[in-house]
Amino acid sequence: GEFAPFFGVQALTMTLLGRLASRTGATVLFAWCERVDTHAGHPGFALHLQSAPDAVSDPDPKIAVAALNAAVEAIARRDPAQYQWTYKRYTLRPPGSGEENPYWNR
């Protein structure tokens, strides 16, 4: 993985998506579900699809992961209450940064 900003904090990000997209020329899409009110007393969901920015498939992994994180962040910012904030993106810190794991309890 490579570190790239996610909500202003360096986050270790997978490079597999960018490598596969770069090698295959495949179209990359983002897909996510949004919880919606059905007015019928049970939850409903709306499925959203969006094309990823071209930079997600850049052969330079640093460019690809920065584009990936920026796009995911933009989706999360649409409705922050719908994002899975329990996913611990910042557990591993950049080497030599002096930053500590923000999830450790002291």
PLM features: residue spans?
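Non-catalytic C-terminal accessory region of glycerolipid acyltransferases
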Residues: 1-106
